[in-house]
Design a protein with these regions (language model features):
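Short, surface-exposed amphipathic charged segments that create phosphate/polyanion-binding patches used
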Residues: 101-110, 169-172, 249-254
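Short internal beta-strands
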Residues: 60-68, 155-157
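A recurrent flexible, glycine/aromatic-enriched loop bordering the glycosyltransferase active site
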Residues: 175-186, 213
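Hydrophobic targeting segments
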Residues: 31-34, 51, 61-64, 264
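Active-site-proximal specificity loops/subdomain of glycosyltransferases
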Residues: 73-120
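GT-A fold catalytic core of metal-dependent nucleotide-sugar glycosyltransferases
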Residues: 91-96, 110-165, 181-197
Length: 338
């Protein structure tokens, strides 16, 4: 059944393919997709590496949907494909139809690429795995690859707890969400059911409605929860273990990452590729970085006042007071010149 709201021929300006798979594995390959802008390229490359490191008996095709990509990163992705004998496809997205959609200071229009991605695979793949670029894999994905989605549009993991679901349900005026509000960073998508539900068309219609948009906090995620309410399969939290590295600033917290965790989702503004994220909880990302073409890339420094403030806080937490003072000075400098 073909029901593309976003026609691949219109939405993809160019596709660059690096296919280093052994011929025997091509037919059985499983498809994993990311939707990013250039700010998440570092994370995306390392995320792909982490999947490969922990699933070396699986043949993959990785798809990176992005609006523009530097040549240096194209070459790194080519090197990654060659090193791990995998396939990586870079899809350059035409963003014209997305430019009118609402964005926030933290999320660009790249958050809507997941709709383009799901439509792209209609009639091509029965099932695909969408991952946010701030996810590190440390376990076996075969249970997801073989999972029967039945008539569900997607398999998902809930976000936070029942109290949070209730609050989101109230804000979004959808009582069904009290049974479960999901995080959209990991989506195992049933492309046939997605097409039958016209998910992308419904999403774009809702995002054009000011009354609906006024109720949204997490644009794409809230919309997906509204459209897919009662049409998703909730799966174990180990497949989207959400953890903010800013929890490390607290006096005490419970880290949900353990040996059973398969996919770690580093939610929040501090990412594992930031130099101030030097905690054991970021090590799964760092280990994958060291096994990737980004191994010699320095961890990122703060590029705006918000990051400078978090950087300073983490410096003090890590007993680096000189760095903390310098970054607070940098924070105030950035605030003044803004």
């Amino acid at each position: 059944m073909s029901a593309h709201y976003f026609n691949p021929q219109e939405m993809i300006n160019k596709t660059i393919i690096f296919d280093e798979r052994p011929a025997a594995s091509v037919a059985s390959s499983f498809h994993v997709a990311y939707g990013i802008d250039k700010n998440f390229l570092f994370g995306c490359g390392v995320s792909i590496t982490s999947v490969l490191l922990h699933n070396n008996d699986v043949s993959f095709v990785f798809h990176v949907f992005i609006d523009a990509i530097p040549e240096a990163d194209i070459q790194r992705l080519a090197q990654l494909a060659k090193s791990y004998r995998t396939c990586i496809q870079i899809h350059l997205v035409n963003c014209e139809r997305l430019k009118a959609l609402p964005t926030t200071k933290n999320w660009s229009i790249a958050m809507y690429f997941r709709f383009v991605i799901a439509d792209y695979f209609i009639d091509q793949q029965d099932k695909i795995l969408y991952l946010d670029a701030d996810i590190a894999c440390q376990g076996n994905l075969k249970p997801l690859i073989t999972m029967d989605l039945a008539n569900n549009v997607a398999a998902v993991v809930t976000e936070r707890d029942a109290n949070w679901w209730s609050l989101r349900g109230q804000s979004l005026q959808c009582n069904e969400l009290e049974k479960g509000y999901f995080n959209s960073g990991v989506l195992l998508i049933n492309t046939l059911a997605w097409a039958q539900e016209s998910v992308s068309a419904k999403a774009m219609s809702m995002l054009a409605d000011k009354a609906v948009v006024s109720r949204l906090t997490y644009m794409d995620q809230d919309i997906l929860n509204l459209i897919l309410s009662g049409k998703v399969k909730f799966i174990d939290a180990k497949y989207n273990t959400q953890f903010s590295l800013n929890y490390e600033l607290k006096k005490s917290f419970v880290c949900p990452i353990n040996d059973e965790t398969v996919l770690i989702h580093y939610v929040g503004p501090t990412k594992p590729w930031h130099y101030w994220a030097g905690y054991p909880s970021a090590q799964p990302f760092i280990k994958a970085k060291e096994a990737s073409p980004w191994k010699n890339e320095p961890l990122m420094r703060p590029v705006n006042s918000n990051y400078a403030r978090y950087c300073a806080k983490h410096n003090f937490k890590q007993n680096k007071p000189i760095n903390g003072i310098m970054n607070y000075i940098y924070y105030f400098y950035l605030k003044i010149i803004k």
